């Protein structure tokens, strides 16, 4: 049974008027992926779904990615095939429109798994990815407002740990996007993000860490969202797939993974989406919101919500 699920990030959507736009964004993305999935390829479906999310400036990935402490964009992305365990990822990449597509090329064109920074950019240029500026006016304005808050309180001189910063300034935690699909033969997972607002230059979250924020094997795939350091420490995407290997379905495994995150790091930290090799979808969160949408064989329209 073919199935695909996408997410637009876990956290709190502070402006209620944004919720319909977010739901429409994940709905459009899952439909883009579903069209590819019906042609038979989970890999193409995941890439297309994530590209649709990257191209929508309401989400924190690709166009509309958040800015680092020094006002730049450093994006992360990863994709993984469950049947072969092939994987590709980029971290701290800039100047490209769709990091997920560069990550796929790392998987298909090299013997490596992860390329970072300038090396990832050079690789993208060699393969014909054009120069692109993903910074939007809205993100630049948000960055300036946050910087002003921090400067007024003197926070920039004595930089806080990320979890302390998020507690005091929750607006720095922005969404990640991801997709997981099953085409009847293989599960594929992909994730993309601009990271955390005002992150230290060079900071890498869970998204490009295979097993941390992105993972797929022969039984299941997962894409995580939230505070990346939590997912890395728990190897959360891999842990979720392991729960399926132990006999859980995708929904039960998703809930177990989030329970694990809450146990060790508290609420308001993580969200996850999954698909297992039986075509079951799963999603769970310990945050107020996590936008999602999914389609399966037998459904006429996607289910979407926050």
Curated annotation (Swiss-Prot):
UniProt note: pH dependence: Optimum pH is 7.0.
Record GO biological process: proteolysis
Pfam families found in the cross-reference section: Asparaginase_2
Residues of the active site: 176
Catalytic activity: L-asparagine + H2O = L-aspartate + NH4(+)
Thermal response of activity: Displays activity at a broad temperature range and is highly thermostable. Optimum temperature is 85 degrees Celsius. Shows a half-life of nearly 18 hours at 85 degrees Celsius.
Cellular component terms (Gene Ontology): cytoplasm
Single GO molecular function: peptidase activity
Activity regulation behaviour: Undergoes auto-cleavage in a temperature-dependent and glycine-independent manner. Metal ions and EDTA do not have any significant effect on enzyme activity, indicating that activity is metal-independent.
Post-translational modification: Autocleaved. Generates the alpha and beta subunits. The N-terminal residue of the beta subunit is thought to be responsible for the nucleophile hydrolase activity. Predominantly produced in the uncleaved form when gene expression is induced at 37 degrees Celsius with 0.5 mM IPTG. When produced at 42 degrees Celsius without adding IPTG, approximately 90% of the protein is found in the cleaved form, while the remaining 10% is observed as uncleaved precursor. Undergoes complete auto-cleavage within 24 hours at 37 degrees Celsius.
Domain of life: Archaea
InterPro entries noted in UniProt: Ntn_hydrolases_N (IPR029055), Peptidase_T2 (IPR000246)
Site (Cleavage): 175-176
Biotechnology: L-asparaginases are widely used in fried and baked food industries to prevent formation of acrylamide, a neurotoxin formed by the reaction of asparagine with reducing sugars. TK2246 reduces the acrylamide formation more than 80% in French fries, chapati and yeast-leavened bread. High activity and effective acrylamide reduction potential, without compromising the sensory properties, make TK2246 a promising candidate for food processing.
Subunit structure: Heterotetramer of two alpha and two beta chains arranged as a dimer of alpha/beta heterodimers. The uncleaved protein forms homodimers.
Role according to the record: Catalyzes the hydrolysis of L-asparagine into L-aspartate and ammonia. Also displays D-asparaginase activity, which is about 10% of the L-asparaginase activity. Does not exhibit glutaminase activity.
Protein name, as recorded: Plant-type L-asparaginase
Organism this protein belongs to: Thermococcus kodakarensis (strain ATCC BAA-918 / JCM 12380 / KOD1) (Pyrococcus kodakaraensis (strain KOD1))
């Amino acid at each position: 049974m073919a199935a695909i699920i996408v997410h637009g990030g876990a956290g709190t959507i502070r402006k209620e008027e944004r919720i319909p736009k977010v739901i429409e964004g994940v709905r459009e993305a899952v439909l883009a992926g579903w069209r590819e999935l019906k042609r038979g390829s989970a890999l193409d479906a995941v890439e297309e779904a994530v590209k649709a999310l990257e191209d929508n400036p309401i989400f924190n990935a690709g166009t509309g990615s958040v800015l680092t402490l020094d006002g730049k964009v450093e994006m992360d992305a990863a994709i993984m095939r469950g049947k072969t365990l092939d994987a590709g990822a980029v971290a701290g990449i800039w100047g490209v429109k769709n990091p997920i597509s560069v990550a796929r090329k790392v998987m298909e064109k090299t013997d490596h798994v992860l390329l970072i920074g300038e090396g990832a950019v050079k690789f993208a240029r060699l393969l014909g990815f054009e120069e692109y500026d993903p910074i939007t006016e809205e993100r630049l304005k948000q960055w300036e407002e946050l910087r002003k808050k921090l400067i007024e309180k003197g926070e920039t001189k004595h930089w806080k740990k990320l979890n302390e910063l998020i507690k005091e300034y929750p607006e720095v935690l922005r969404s990640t996007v991801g997709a997981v699909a099953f085409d009847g033969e293989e599960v594929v997972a992909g994730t993309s993000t601009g990271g955390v607002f005002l992150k230290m230059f060079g900071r890498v979250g869970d998204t490009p860490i295979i097993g941390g924020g992105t993972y797929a094997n022969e039984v299941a795939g997962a894409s995580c969202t939230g505070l990346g350091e939590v997912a890395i420490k728990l190897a959360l995407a891999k842990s979720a797939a392991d729960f399926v290997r132990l006999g859980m379905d995708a929904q039960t495994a998703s809930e177990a993974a989030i329970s694990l995150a809450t146990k060790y790091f508290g609420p308001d930290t993580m969200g996850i989406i999954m698909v297992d090799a039986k075509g079951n979808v799963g999603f769970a969160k310990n945050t107020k919101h996590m936008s999602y949408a999914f389609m399966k064989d037998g459904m006429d329209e996607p289910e979407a919500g926050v």
